[in-house]
Design a protein with these regions (language model features):
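Hydrolase active-site cap/lid region
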Residues: 217-311
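Membrane-embedded segments
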Residues: 71-190
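Serine-hydrolase catalytic core
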Residues: 71-72, 280, 285-417
Length: 417
């Protein structure tokens, strides 16, 4: 009996200690610095021991990647890669000097990579916004760039641009929601204004995980601007739509995400132990600083939500090609989060919402694959000016889905439709 009591006491104090640790973690996450460190994980940074300028170590030709620096309006320096398809590397082998020092040039506009894009009116651009942690050359990211470059043809070369947000890799600064939006808009402003002057209709934006939130925010900023006069705005007035916007493994917003997010599918969702304490859950959610409301942003982009303070009267006649792809076996951000974004974009639960389903396809045997297409024909005539495609695929997980053919086909479809 004494031994049983001793075991019960040990179990009790072990549970009490675990509970205390959990409560301490939740409370610590209400502090801005700790919260953002956990969200962005930018301190998990292989750039401390990896040289991102040595692009051969990531599987590229030295001549295939032109590193560059980009200075934001708030004076942060972002590091990026301009990646070329192999057929351009072969065709312009003499111009692309493999003996040049690794790293960004003092004047990027003097580089062959810049000239190959700037002087080709048929060239296309894919902007890739990566997820949290590490840098632009980490994990599956180089493979995803190679997949995108593989879509390039001599008639329509595809150039890929990727940056590290502020505080990531060797970029300066500290990440915040508005900070990352500034970073994304700065890159798109760089591409769409002088000296490049690339029309948005030749640009597809692809985001994965955290990058989907950046993608949605940048697209919204280009569509509507910002009511804040001090915020970054599109460099070109009333820009035309992007060729496509693709969200891979997205989430509706951060308060919703923390109810279901699991680190690598190993940990339980952070608020799951508080399911029986809704007030405490609400308190924890209310302390989230960077909410990243992708669901709200796509609803405004599709015209389902028209409550934007400074609605652009010209936007109703403009196109939107939005694709949302989520893997059924994503153990980090469950596919239902992607479905929430689809529901917000299409107004699935909004009475008298505009638009309607134009296509749906599901596995006949009740399998995981699903395709839904919604169109909002709010423009003149019968043109479908807003289109949203939802794809749930069986495989790809959270990160690898960005390297799968489904993602490549979405980019190809965006350029060709």
């Amino acid at each position: 009996m004494v031994e049983t009591n001793s075991l019960l006491k040990k179990a009790y104090w072990s549970l009490a200690a675990a509970g205390l640790v959990y409560v301490s973690i939740v409370i610590s996450l209400t502090y801005p610095a700790v919260q953002r460190l956990a969200l962005y994980a930018n301190k998990v940074n292989p750039a401390y021991w990896e040289d991102v300028n040595l692009v051969e170590s990531f599987g590229f030709l030295k001549t295939q990647v032109q590193p560059f620096n980009l200075v934001t309006p708030d004076n942060e320096t972002l590091y990026g890669w301009h990646l070329l398809p192999l057929h351009l590397c072969r065709e312009h082998e003499a111009e692309l000097d493999s003996d040049k020092p690794a790293g960004p040039e003092d004047d990027y506009t003097t580089t062959p990579a810049f000239k190959l894009l700037a002087n080709d009116p048929n060239a296309r651009v894919v902007v890739s916004f990566h997820g949290n942690a590490a840098h632009l050359g980490s994990a599956q990211r180089p493979e995803s760039y190679r997949m995108l470059l593989g879509l390039s043809t001599p008639q329509n070369p595809i150039h890929v641009f990727a940056i590290d947000y502020r505080g990531f890799g060797i970029s300066t600064g500290t990440p915040t929601e508005e900070g990352l939006i500034i970073d994304g808009v700065t890159l798109l402003n760089f591409l769409t204004s002088a000296p490049y002057n690339i029309p948005p209709s030749r640009i597809v934006i692809v985001g994965q995980s955290l990058g989907t939130a950046v993608t949605a925010a940048v697209t919204e900023r280009f569509a509507f601007g910002s009511p804040d006069p001090t915020a970054i705005q599109p460099a070109i007035k009333d820009p035309e739509p992007f060729a496509g916007v693709i969200l891979l493994a997205c989430f509706s917003n951060l308060p919703n995400l923390i109810e279901s997010y699991s680190v690598k599918g190993i940990t339980p969702p952070i608020l799951s132990p508080l399911k029986g304490y809704p007030r405490v859950q609400k308190w924890a959610r209310s302390h989230i600083l960077d909410t990243w409301d992708t669901a709200g942003r796509v609803a405004r982009l599709t015209g389902v939500n028209t409550t934007l303070e400074i609605a652009n009267p010209f936007y109703i006649e403009k196109a939107l090609d939005l694709t949302i792809i989520h893997a059924k076996n994503d153990v980090e951000i469950p596919w239902r989060e992607g479905r929430r974004v689809w529901m917000a974009a299409t107004g699935e639960r909004v009475k008298d919402a505009p638009g309607a389903l134009s296509f749906e396809k599901r596995d006949a045997n009740g399998g995981p694959n699903e395709v839904l297409i919604w169109e909002n024909k709010s423009g003149k005539g019968d043109k479908a000016v807003k289109r949203v495609r939802w794809e749930r695929v069986a495989y790809g997980g959270h990160n690898r889905v960005a390297t799968f053919s489904t993602a490549a086909l979405a980019v190809l479809r965006a350029f060709e439709e």
